[in-house]
UniProtKB/Swiss-Prot annotation:
It comes from the Bacteria. Keywords: Cytoplasm, GTP-binding, Hydrolase, Magnesium, Metal-binding, Nucleotide-binding. GO terms for cellular component: cytoplasm. It comes from Pseudomonas putida (strain GB-1). Mg(2+) binds at S173, T193. Its EC number is 3.6.5.-. This is GTPase Obg. Belongs to the TRAFAC class OBG-HflX-like GTPase superfamily. OBG GTPase family. Residues 129-143 have a biased composition (Polar residues). CDD domains: Obg. Residues 1-159 form the Obg domain. GTP binds at residues 166-173, 191-195, 213-216, 283-286, 314-316.
């Protein structure tokens, strides 16, 4: 199944129906007067969050969506039928953006939530509306108003409580397999994970949280290298980040260097996301001797000047994973309780969330702009003149911002 998390579409609300000009005509009634009815309102376009969807692939192939036009008014004061509204179903966690102004129209974060993205046109008036004491036979009507038309960009972010960060082959997919029922692909080569994977971690019988695994980051990811930069946005709505570090890399590289790369790339992508609660998880502890393991752990802590929680685990043998899962559940419960009872804390987190969203969107927009420049053969925006044939035609733009990966 194709995983698509960004698409561009055009929506058009229905036009309003025209008013009718008609006069009453009956036997023995010489001057029956006007009886033209109003037109019907045009249908509006809504986005609806559907918890059964996890990709925007349907909108990759169908880019134009139009609601029904309102019917024209009829004689004998008959009002035209209202156009049917159009409901476009999208995954929960979808952000809808006006492509022309970059204004965020809304976020769909709860199942069943509806968002109007295009208002239907107002109905036209029939000639009955213009009857007066001085104008007994009006021949005036009004046409229906056109419905809104908008070019939209939709961005989907997975909704998870915990997000995993790390270099390729740090053991993120193995970790999510060990603590949940999710079965992402695991192999001994980089970039095994190509799309985000979600898993539900059940701690007790009635307690659970959702964890998200994204493709690994590499050095230079904030400039577009590798796969992870596109998927960092999926961590924007997580509540806590787990930074996984491989302390027994096959290439015998320094775990401290690897940990530092992730921190640097995260900070370059979004300084505010780097402020999110983050725990250090040192993986593959069963592959080194105890003395060497402790030395490598301390080296990572010293290099990062780490002061937060530290966990030493082995995901494949599940050493330390139960304690980590219980601690995460406890943190999430305490966080939710504090959010409900501490308005200042809630306001602080809301401000942080907004800054993360803004910075992530700005980074991704910059990457899209750079890709557009490369496609047109322009090295810099400063090289574009007023009449250089800059392509703003939505119809011909087959390379919108959608990114497609194939889920195994």
């Amino acid at each position: 199944m194709k995983f698509v998390d960004e698409v561009s579409i055009r929506v058009k609300a229905g036009d309003g129906g025209n008013g009718c000009m008609s006069f009453r005509r009956e036997k023995f009634i010489e001057n029956g007067g006007p009886n033209g009815g109003d037109g019907g309102d045009g249908g509006s376009v809504y986005m609806v969050a559907d918890e059964n969807l996890n990709t925007l692939v349907d909108y990759r192939y169908t880019r134009h969506h139009e609601a029904q036009r309102g019917s024209n008014g009829g004689s004998t004061d008959c009002t035209g039928k209202k156009g049917e509204d159009l409901f476009l179903r999208v995954p929960v966690g979808t952000t809808v953006i006006d492509a022309s102004t970059q204004e965020v129209i809304g976020d769909l974060v709860t199942p069943g939530q509806k968002l109007m993205v295009a208002q239907g046109g107002w109905h036209g008036l029939g000639n009955t509306r213009f009857k007066s004491s001085t104008n007994r036979a009006p021949r005036q009507t009004t046409p229906g108003k056109p419905g809104d038309q908008r070019d939209l960009k939709m961005e989907m972010k997975v909704l998870a409580d915990v997000g995993l960060l790390g270099l390729p082959n740090a053991g993120k997919s193995t970790f999510i397999r060990s603590v949940s029922a999710a079965k992402p692909k695991v192999a001994d080569y980089p970039f095994t994970t190509l799309v985000p994977n979600l898993g539900v971690v059940s701690v007790d019988r009635w307690k659970s949280f959702v964890i998200a695994d994204i493709p690994g980051l590499i050095e230079g990811a904030s400039e577009g290298a590798g796969l992870g930069i596109r998927f960092l946005k999926h961590l924007a709505r997580t509540r806590v980040l787990l930074h996984l570090v491989d302390i027994a890399p096959l290439d015998e590289s320094s775990p401290a260097d690897a940990a530092e790369v992730i921190v640097n790339e995260l900070t370059r992508f979004s300084p505010s996301l780097a402020e999110r609660e983050r725990w250090l998880v040192l993986n593959k502890s069963d592959m080194v001797m105890d003395d060497e393991r402790d030395e490598r752990v301390q080296e990572v802590i010293d290099r990062l000047e780490w002061e937060g929680p530290v966990y030493v685990i082995s995901a494949i043998s599940k050493q330390g994973t139960d304690k980590l899962s219980h601690d995460l559940m406890r943190y999430l419960e305490d966080r939710a309780d504090r959010l409900a009872n501490d308005p200042a804390y809630a306001e602080e987190l809301a401000d942080l969330d907004q800054r993360i969203e803004d910075e992530a969107r700005a980074q991704l927009q910059a990457l899209d702009d750079a890709r557009t420049l490369r496609r047109t053969g322009v090295k810099s925006v400063h090289d574009i003149g007023d009449d250089d044939g800059w392509d703003d035609d939505f119809e011909d733009d087959e390379d919108g911002p959608e990114i497609i990966y194939v889920r195994d």
